[in-house]
């Protein structure tokens, strides 16, 4: 199948041609672990998980390397640690914050149905030169200084943006427009106001590593340059993240990596997902519409109920990844209704058997058009109506195997229901026993006993549906009352 991706750098949709089809390489910026991930953070996690699945489908499971980092050294982490654990030494407090937050992040993304990336490096593991020879931050900074792209000033090491003629190409911001940019700190010791920190000195209490420039810690941008190079090399296929990372983070990553390695590019395709707002407004703690993934999963703060992770995932995928998304209760309720109906169709089948629907594959290959793919899944679900026998079975299997490409319908109906805190589960063996008794009662025309068993099941929260199977024989199916 053909895969075309929109490249932020060239501002066009291009055919995807990997550097090495036997090892397709993708890097996506991960969390800074100072606070639980909010629902906006979930979008790139889900979007690039779908791309990871698609690349594995095209090139093979063992031929895709997906790296998503964890930033565990940052001034925001220091501030949170000092606030939350004022009685502890800062380094110990930082360890508590980062471990708890990283653990919660992993639980959140698992609940969203995301596959684990191939590698999840932590920034603190790549500050100093490593025994395995993988790229590290100190060595990259040395290379930048040696090549004339960085300098020491005011106790810091800074990147000289004027040393890179096409700095700003990704974001479209010309250097002369950035001299008084709102997001750029202007310091007297900088050669140019847009120069950014590669290394900063640490106080006695702050996290720090011994380096040629004194005890200090890395700047944010150099971390991703080191970790991507460590696992993917100097140039790789895809770099992803949210629109908010284009400038300054991704712009500065490109500058550091290209100048340190002497390459003309860092990644061949730059992909960015759109912004998320909540009920028509920008998400903000001050507006009271700021929600973490964990809050949506485990509390009733949004919409008066707890939401299964798969519902959150589908709600994200119904909008194209480059379009803005309005996160609403109505959208989640609709997504839940859709999943409920799809799981009613696939039931407790455990395997995704057969070929992925051609149209679903084509939509995903067209710049990851999950919105169109979801619409096509609706059509597949509807196509089983009026069919019987093998045709009905084929439609059901096509729905499941195609939805799995999006990370949906990857479990049995019962397993799905178990993820919904609002659903009361019952003993399926007991239900099967009672259904057998009811069938026997109906066969001997003991309708009073049949109705009694039906009422007993209803009291357990079980709804019966009497009908016929694919061969036209009487059949009773059941589901949990919703």
UniProtKB/Swiss-Prot annotation:
Gene3D superfamilies: Cysteine-tRNA ligase, C-terminal anti-codon recognition domain, HUPs. ATP binds at residue 285. One of its GO terms (molecular function) is cysteine-tRNA ligase activity. The gene is cysS. Pfam families: CysS_C, tRNA-synt_1e. Its cofactor is Zn(2+). Monomer. A motif ('KMSKS' region) lies at residues 282-286. Belongs to the class-I aminoacyl-tRNA synthetase family. This is Cysteine--tRNA ligase. It is found in: Cytoplasm. A motif ('HIGH' region) lies at residues 31-41. It catalyses: tRNA(Cys) + L-cysteine + ATP = L-cysteinyl-tRNA(Cys) + AMP + diphosphate.
């Amino acid at each position: 199948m053909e895969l075309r991706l929109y490249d932020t750098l060239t501002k066009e949709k291009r055919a995807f041609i990997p550097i090495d089809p036997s090892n397709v390489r993708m890097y996506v910026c991960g969390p800074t672990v100072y606070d639980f991930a909010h629902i906006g953070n979930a979008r790139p996690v889900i979007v690039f998980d779908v791309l990871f699945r698609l690349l594995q489908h095209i090139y093979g499971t063992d031929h895709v390397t997906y790296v998503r980092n964890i930033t565990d050294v940052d001034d925001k982490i220091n501030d949170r640690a000092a606030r939350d654990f004022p009685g502890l030494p800062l380094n110990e407090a930082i360890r508590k914050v980062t471990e708890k937050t990283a653990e919660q992040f992993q639980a959140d993304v698992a609940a969203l149905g995301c596959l684990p990336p191939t590698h999840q490096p932590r920034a603190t593991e790549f500050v100093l030169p490593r025994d395995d020879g993988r790229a590290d931050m100190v060595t990259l900074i040395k290379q930048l200084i040696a090549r004339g792209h960085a300098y020491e000033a005011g106790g810091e090491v800074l990147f000289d943006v004027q040393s890179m003629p096409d700095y700003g190409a990704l974001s479209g911001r010309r250097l002369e427009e950035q001299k008084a940019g709102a997001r750029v700190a202007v310091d007297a010791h900088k050669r140019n106001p847009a120069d950014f920190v590669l290394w900063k000195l640490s106080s006695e209490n702050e996290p720090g590593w011994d380096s040629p420039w004194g005890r200090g810690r890395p700047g944010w941008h150099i971390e991703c340059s080191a970790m991507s190079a460590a696992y993917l090399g100097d140039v790789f296929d895809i770099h992803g993240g949210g629109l908010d990372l284009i400038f300054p983070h991704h712009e500065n990553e490109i500058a550091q990596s290209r100048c340190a390695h002497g390459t003309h590019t860092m990644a061949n395709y730059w992909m960015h997902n759109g912004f998320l707002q909540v009920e028509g407004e920008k998400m903000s703690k001050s507006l009271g519409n700021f929600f973490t993934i964990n809050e949506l999963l485990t509390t009733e703060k949004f919409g008066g109920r707890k939401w299964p992770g798969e519902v959150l995932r589908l709600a994200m995928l119904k909008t194209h990844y480059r379009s803005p998304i309005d996160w609403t209760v109505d959208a989640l309720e609709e997504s839940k209704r859709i999943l409920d109906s799809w799981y009613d169709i696939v039931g407790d089948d455990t395997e995704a058997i057969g070929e992925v629907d051609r149209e679903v594959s084509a939509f995903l290959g067209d710049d990851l058009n999950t919105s169109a793919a979801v619409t096509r899944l609706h059509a597949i679900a509807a196509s089983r109506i009026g069919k019987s026998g093998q045709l009905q079975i084929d439609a059901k299997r096509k729905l499941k195997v195609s939805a799995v490409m999006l990370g949906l319908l990857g479990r049995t109906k019962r397993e799905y229901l178990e993820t919904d805190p609002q659903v009361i589960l019952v003993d399926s063996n007991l239900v099967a026993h009672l259904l057998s008794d009811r069938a026997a009662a109906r066969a001997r025309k003991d309708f009073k006993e049949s109705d009694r068993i039906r009422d007993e099941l209803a009291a357990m929260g079980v709804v019966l549906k009497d009908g016929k199977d694919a061969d036209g024989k009487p059949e009773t199916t059941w589901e949990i009352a919703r």
